[in-house]
Amino acid sequence: KRGESQVITFKIISTDEEYLDEKIFKKVVKYLDEVVNHPLVIDGGFKEEYVAIEKENLKNRIESIINDKGRYAVERAREEMFKNEKYGISDLGYLADIDKITAKGLYEHYVNIMKTSPIDIVVEGNFDEDEIVEIISNGFDFHRENIIEIPRADFIKKVDEIKVIKEEMDITQGKLVMGYRCNVDYKDEFKYYSLFVGSNVLGGGPHSKLFVNVREKESLCYYIYSSLEKYKTSMFISSGIESENYDKTVELIGEQLKSLKEGKISDEELLNSKSAIISSLKTIKDSLGGSSDFYFSQSMGGTNTTVEKIIEMIEKVTVSDIVEAFKNIELDTIYFLSNNKEA
């Protein structure tokens, strides 16, 4: 899921033809086309046995989320924060809906998706571009009609009232999640990457304000970090705390964000954050499929910016740029999962 868009991804990996005695890319595309456009269909639907297996697998995945209390807390915070928005819908769906899925209904839904949804094809590797474009153009048996235009997610929203959600569970460590609306247009790339650097200064690792001041100096949490969601330009701060430290932790997190917004960022904090981000960006091309995932994400955002260009922007970010990017950020939701009824 990217923002408010549910994304279905098919991936196939093959050996570089340079190391083979024959050209295989046409065969690779044909195989992928068979999987995507000609799946096994029986009596107008997917095979019942396969659907039943996948329904159970999905149930298990949904049920397993609760075993990872940190992830569960973030999911619940997101669900509450975006309750009346598409982004609040779980990417895995809900247990109550799974039994309603039929083999025939699922296949009909799949066919409709393949006919009407936008499709991006990304190829990563060592190849002749013109040859690859020709093979792909002729290699897929898509049947397209009435292609829908997916609207851009709303990213600007005024917070009328901060939501505070407290829930209880049999756990040994409380989970605190604070959700913020950044109110920044990600298509304003320099401002977005200024926001990105600022988020890293705030909670991006051992060098960050939250880690140093909340975890190390005050010993209020077991872990703490901040993360951004690009397409909704929202930020979540997540931490594991003792229930009795709830009020103090919320207060201190607020103080660290206030410090950031006031431009109280040292040269060391800024340099460490930039270095961490740039090092991460440079590894994209080192991982199998890293570049294709990156450029698909860029395509979805309508930006199509290279890694090198992003690094240039990161290097140019100043403290005043961060202050400007964080100018309109607002706390929207506080979610606390506790084992203490008095928390």
Region annotations inferred by a language model:
Residues 1-38, 71-93, 118-124, 178, ...:
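M16 family metallopeptidases and their MPP-like homologs
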Residues 18-67:
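Hydrophobic alpha-helical hairpins/lids featuring a short glycine-rich hinge
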Residues 32, 178, 189-202, 214:
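Active/ligand-binding-proximal structured segments within catalytic/core domains
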Residues 37-41, 63, 111, 115, ...:
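Sec-exported extracytoplasmic/periplasmic mature domains
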Residues 59-66, 161-175, 278-288:
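Short, low-order "capping/linker" segments at domain edges
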Residues 95-96, 112-116, 120-185, 343:
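An aromatic/glycine/proline-enriched structural segment found at the starts
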Residues 152-156, 193, 211-212:
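Phosphate-proximal small/polar/acidic motifs at interfaces that engage nucleotide phosphates
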